[in-house]
Amino acid sequence: MGQKSIFNTNMNIKHYMQKAKLVDTIRAMGAKAGAEAHPDRETVEARLDALRQERRLAARKVSTTKKMAKRGASQEEIDKEMQEITESLSPATPSSHIQVTPLFTTFKITMTVRPPTRRRLDPPNLSPTLKALVDGLTDACWWDDDDYRHLVETSFRYGGLSGTPGEWRIVLDVEEVDPSGYVTSN
């Protein structure tokens, strides 16, 4: 991962859209890597395509609604436009209808961080990067969800230098665990 693809809790991102773009980029990287490593790669990629279309559809609806409301359009006009957008941009098969067997049920993740420089590093400060990668792996059907019932433990560790100038190496070790050793219910 390049330096610009790392999200650190100490970063001072001035605008929420910059943060959102960075998180989306990292999430997409996680989803791509997850799809490539998944045994049912073709189905996962079809699901990821459907998810991308659904996100585009949702963003288009929000944008169009705001523009039309600003122009003073009636609710009927807005509803008609939303219907047209839905018909033109909806995926042929919704992502929720594309079933893939998850690889893990109850699991823990260890994130090993290998930075490009000897500069001081606190691996847990990369938790926003881990969260975005985990969300991408969730999209790639590695597990049903990354809530407390499924992802029961995360840890971080330093793994030495990456060996490549300007490039970070992040390794996620995912391990299935016995849920009886963790609190997985309310």
Go through each PLM region and give its residues.
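Catalytic phosphate/metal-binding cores of nucleic-acid and nucleotide-processing enzymes, i.e., regions
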Residues: 1-186
